[in-house]
């Protein structure tokens, strides 16, 4: 029963991330979260289409 809910949670999380990426994909190059003394930074490295 718990595995069923865990699988559903993972699927919802993946769909949320995919949807967010599709919505802001053109402007998503850097994502930064700062909280107190912790900083999380994700940078997207890619080459634009020619």
Curated annotation (Swiss-Prot):
Induction: Repressed by LexA, induced by DNA damage. Toxic component of a type I toxin-antitoxin (TA) system; if it expressed it could be neutralized by antisense antitoxin RNA SokE. InterPro entries: Hok/gef_toxin, Hok/gef_toxin_CS. Keywords: Cell inner membrane, Cell membrane, Membrane, Toxin-antitoxin system, Transmembrane, Transmembrane helix. Pfam families: HOK_GEF. The keyword Protein biosynthesis does not apply. Belongs to the Hok/Gef family. This is Toxic protein HokE. It is found in: Cell inner membrane. The chain crosses the membrane at residues 5-25. One of its GO terms (biological process) is DNA damage response. The keyword Coiled coil does not apply. GO terms for cellular component: plasma membrane. Interrupted by an IS186 element, which silences the locus in strain K12 MG1655. It is a single-pass membrane protein.
